[in-house]
Amino acid sequence: MNLKDKSLFLGLGCCGGKQAKKLIEDYGYKGIAVNGSEQDLKALGNINKYHLSGFDGFGGHREKSIDCLSENEDFLDYVEHINEKIIFVLFGGGGSTGSGCATILTEMLSQNLDKKRIVCPVITLPSADEAIIKHSNAYQAVQELQEIDGLGATFFINNDIDKDYEYINSTFAKFIDTFLSNDAYT
């Protein structure tokens, strides 16, 4: 059994959902896309999804994530019962749904010592030409991630590499699949 079979991708917000879709559809990984926007979830097609009811995006306000998660207890229960050993938390650092929920969920997943999981945040950084609030959200998310003990590898995806975000997501998916599907690591 390779690491692929032990992994799950939790895609938060619009960016994380698109990344999770790529890994689920193109490489056969287990995963789920999570968002408050039904429109964003619908655009992802036929993959596992969870709608954060009552929150159609946070409008740039990461602090709404605490209220959102507390009002979606069934989603927190789902997260608590994830059995895979390696969990990748995918999100756009500049967004508010992903960057706000990701740090809370990453900490929650990594603190459950009974499950002995490896939790790996994957933060996509905003492009240099994006609004200052996007950079502020990403900065706050990175600061919060640094304070979480026991994290696995943290991946940073640089959106300044290319304006073709599909290409960036495809490249990351290919590289992570090459690593996780290699039988030499088991």
Give the label of every model feature segment:
Residues 1-186:
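Tubulin/FtsZ superfamily GTPase core signature
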